[in-house]
Amino acid sequence: GAEASNYPFCTIDQNVGTAPVPDPNLQQLAGILHPSEVTPASIRFVDIAGLVPGASRGEGLGNQFLAHVRDVDAILHVVRCFADPNVAHTTGEADPRRDAALVETEFLLADLDVAERALQKWSHAARTGVADAKEAAAAFEHVASGLRQGTAVRALHFTDKELVHLAESRFL
């Protein structure tokens, strides 16, 4: 695994672990279907370095952190809720609400950057007559508008057409 120590920016590489997902029905199904191989489900956990204010602008390991986060299917955010002078904290002291809000804010800002770049691209394409570009631009404007108001992409509501245009965007 990657190094993990008690000081900021010590964890550069991600730590990865895999755990089986128990399924009592798996053997029953195998008995009925007789497959050549039975492969139980598993879940892969990726522990990545934390972030600091300004990560969405590349500060600290921000760009690397956000790239790792974009590659996962789900995010489990673990927040430190204890004070211990022997365990360093990037801001000097643990404040769970502030720390959780920091991550959420950095995600919103990073997503806003993605949405605004896509909006610019599709707006230009719409001016040159590219098919569906106006619809794509409208979808990204919807996202950008919500993010500017502090609403995460996951909390916004989209039409099926908007979802088609947003599908490859890898929002956090």
Spans of model-derived segments:
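Conserved G1/Walker A P-loop phosphate-binding module
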Residues: 1-88, 97, 104-106, 115-117, ...
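Charge-rich, low-complexity amphipathic helices
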Residues: 15-17, 34, 51, 91, ...
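Alpha-helical scaffold segments in soluble metabolic enzymes
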Residues: 28, 102, 114, 139-142, ...
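Short secondary-structure junctions and interdomain/linker hinges
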Residues: 36-39, 110, 114, 147-154
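Amphipathic alpha-helical coiled-coil segments with heptad-repeat character
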Residues: 62, 93, 100, 105, ...
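C-terminal-of-GTPase-core extension/linker across diverse P-loop GTPases
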Residues: 118-172
